[in-house]
Curated annotation (Swiss-Prot):
UniProt keyword annotation of Kinase present: no
Active-site residue numbers: C310
Function: E3 ubiquitin-protein ligase, which catalyzes ubiquitination of target proteins together with ubiquitin-conjugating enzyme E2 UBE2L3. Acts as an atypical E3 ubiquitin-protein ligase by working together with cullin-5-RING ubiquitin ligase complex (ECS complex, also named CRL5 complex) and initiating ubiquitination of ECS substrates: associates with ECS complex and specifically mediates addition of the first ubiquitin on ECS targets. The initial ubiquitin is then elongated.
Result of altering C257A: Does not affect interaction with UBE2L3
Species in which this protein is naturally found: Homo sapiens (Human)
EC number(s) recorded for this UniProt protein: 2.3.2.31
Protein's recorded name: E3 ubiquitin-protein ligase ARIH2
Length: 493
């Protein structure tokens, strides 16, 4: 199958956030170029039997609308308020403090109910409580004489006038604070229940903001819930067991890690990927690598631009086959062990000067970063290839050269390629921070095997007319099994 290398992928549109919407809006049509689409519709196209059917990324989750999430939260709150004999607002503060783990709350309540309320910051700690030292009927903020009925306080009895409370709450809500609105007294930890704050907000606009911030804080504190990070998306993801696993919103199709809400990053764990991304953003030395799109052919020295995702390059002038990453001859590149992904440590570096160690550290970082960035660029180029395949299939169907079913395997191959390369990209931060030893050697071996099969698949996808369907689907199966094996052995978070 030949494809036009100049066409571009389309952009996806995102819907506005509307927490008051009663019904879910219809899902938008999938954009074939989106990274979020990598995992869709692939599993059914690669036959799995026995142990091969095990998917290390399998993870049960549910997508909830705003109303469904609110209903689930209110159900917990109503039940707990009834058992603890507290107001609904206080019950919510207790739930937030204990991450909505009701069984733990009830156990603590049975053992020491007073301490539970202190820990939830709804009652003062008797041993540390400092009563107000201001004259009676005086506001402790503006120091004005105030009628008793205009003085308001929480359980700590720190009294302030209604005007100061209104100003305090309004400023905090404008700054995006929800559950965090607290007593104005210095060093007083007590939080204000929502039924205390709402009457103090002067207009409906602020009250609506406060509702949204409360909902955000309630969801973020719940150990089984995460807000979808998609732009203006109101959906909430619910799981039974919180883990660093891939979830996807069924409204905006955003794919992310449930635990950290960042882009899905298996096999790298959440803390490591944060460290890696911070390092990439901070290190100015990477700028030259980010902008590098061309290299010289190692045989005839003609300048070559990479316009596809495959790292198996063929010079258009001399027809020399070489690796884009290391410029090695492709014929001997992966004959026994795919060396291109493995960094060779200098065993004597600990005995050398600090300057030499710094140079070695930079060399190591650039080695991994260049490969990380190269696969990122390959993903973007292969997304364009996917779009062109999609358009080519449409053209063939319109010309009665087969049905969608006949050509669907080409799209599935491009999707699986992106899925595998996406995993491969995130193996490089994992390897960069990994301690040397037998486990790292095993990881590098599996990483190399995966990379070799991905490049074989990429080569065949970009030259689909030269390979029959069985050959392509066999390569898909091999690449996916390499990917699953690596994740099964190393994605243990």
């Amino acid at each position: 199958m030949s494809v036009d290398m100049n066409s571009q992928g389309s952009d996806s549109n995102e819907e506005d956030y509307d927490p008051n919407c009663e019904e879910e809006e219809e899902e938008e049509e999938d954009d074939p170029g989106d990274i979020e689409d990598y995992y869709v519709g692939v599993a059914s196209d690669v036959e799995q039997q026995g142990a091969d059917a095990f998917d290390p990324e399998e993870y049960q989750f549910t997508c909830l609308t705003y109303k469904e999430s609110e209903g689930a939260l209110n159900e917990h709150m109503t039940s707990l308020a009834s058992v603890l004999k507290v107001s609904h607002s206080v019950a919510k503060l207790i739930l937030v403090n204990f991450h909505w783990q009701v069984s733990e709350i009830l156990d603590r309540y049975k053992s020491n109910s007073a301490q539970l309320l202190v820990e939830a910051r709804v009652q003062p700690n008797p041993s540390k409580h400092v009563p107000t030292s201001h004259p009676p009927h005086h506001c402790a903020v503006c120091m004005q004489f105030v009628r008793k009925e205009n003085l308001l306080s929480l359980a700590c009895q720190h009294q302030f006038c209604r005007s100061c409370w209104e100003q305090h709450c309004s400023v905090l809500v404008k700054d995006g604070v929800g559950v965090g609105v607290s007593c104005m007294a210095q060093d007083c930890p007590l939080r204000t229940p929502e039924d205390f704050v709402f009457p103090l907000l002067p207009n409906e606009e602020l009250r609506e903001k406060y509702r949204r911030y409360l909902f955000r804080d309630y969801v973020e504190s719940h150990y089984q819930l995460q807000l979808c990070p998609g732009a203006d998306c109101p959906m909430v993801i619910r799981v039974q067991e919180p883990r660093a696993r891939r979830v996807q919103c069924n409204r905006c199709n955003e794919v992310f890690c449930f635990k950290c809400r960042q882009m899905y990053h298996a096999p790298t764990d959440c803390a490591t990927i944060r460290k890696w991304l911070t390092k990439c953003a901070d290190d100015s030395e990477t700028a030259n690598y980010i902008s590098a799109h061309t290299k010289d052919c190692p045989k005839c020295n003609i300048c070559i631009e990479k316009n596809g995702g495959c790292n198996h390059m063929q010079c258009s002038k001399c027809k020399h086959d070489f690796c884009w990453m290391c410029l090695g001859d492709w014929k001997t590149h992966g004959s026994e062990y795919y060396e291109c992904s493995r960094y060779k440590e200098n065993p004597d570096i600990v005995n050398q000067s600090q300057q030499a160690q710094a140079r070695e550290a930079l060399k190591k970082y650039l080695f991994y970063f260049e490969r990380w960035e190269n696969h990122n660029k390959s993903l973007q180029l292969e997304a364009q290839t996917y779009q062109r395949i999609h358009e080519k299939i449409q053209e063939r169907v319109m010309n009665n050269l087969g049905t969608w079913i006949d050509w669907q395997y080409l799209q599935n191959a491009a999707k699986l390629l992106a899925k595998c390369r996406y995993t491969l990209q995130y193996t490089y931060p994992y390897a960069y921070y990994m301690e040397s030893g037998p486990r790292k050697k095993l990881f590098e071996y599996q990483q190399a095997q995966l990379e070799a099969e991905i490049e074989n698949l990429s080569w065949k996808v970009e030259r689909a007319d030269s390979y029959d369907r069985g050959d392509l689907e066999n390569q898909m199966h091999i690449a996916e099994q390499r990917r699953r094996t690596l994740l099964k052995d190393f994605h243990d978070t």
